[in-house]
Amino acid sequence: MALTLEQLNTAAAVQGHEVFNVGMDGDNDHRLTYIHLGICAALLLNARAVDFVVAGCGTGQGALMSLNAWPGVYCGYCIEPTDAFLFAQVNNGNALSLPFAKGYGWGAEINIRYIFEKAFAGERGQGYPAERRESQMTNAGILAQVKQGASKDFIAGLKSIDPALVKQAVGGARFQQAFFDNAQDAEIVAYVKGVLGQ
């Protein structure tokens, strides 16, 4: 993760952008899943605390779905520079999801063929590796709840999901600093303060 943040800071500095690392910074940091990342991104973007969010998870797919579950978040999936360019130029979204564990390499034509073969073969939702199945299925169920709740007014959506999810998402010191220093939507700021008991 340090290498990712280093490269993001370098690229952003060239363009005159400021970077806030509000996610995890290591295994001993404030614990966030891709579900929490979606909540954080939605709060930051809808409150206009930031203009763009870079997120991710092991494969990048969970973060992509979690961010896109929320109104006001338009997240693309990026595994190579062409993806980032086309997303920025064609889709003009406000978030990217990156795979932080899964690699991508030579033989793109073979890779895409295997992607399609694997996507349509066998029963879906079985988890991988097997020992992570339960947590993956739990997170998939939670994400479905989040999407259902988020399909309402933004704050009504936040209020309709498990409050513990939101409290965990906003509990990190770096998130709070970036959010409270930059948020421009008073209603969303008041909601987050209420969640934090302020």
Question: Model-flagged regions — what are they?
Answer:
Residues 1-6, 10, 85-198:
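C-terminal binding/interaction regions
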Residues 2, 38, 60-66:
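Short glycine/serine/threonine-rich phosphate/pyrophosphate-binding segments
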Residues 9-18, 69-72:
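Short helix-loop-beta junction
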Residues 16-31:
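A short beta-strand-loop structural module common to alpha/beta enzyme folds
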Residues 24-25, 78-84, 100-102:
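Short, acidic/turn-prone active-site loops that include or flank metal/cofactor-
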Residues 34-53:
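Short, structured active-site "lid" loops
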Residues 51-55, 74-76, 93-97:
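Structural motif
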Residues 62-75, 79-83:
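Short Gly/Thr/Asp-enriched flexible loops that form oxyanion-binding sites at enzyme active sites
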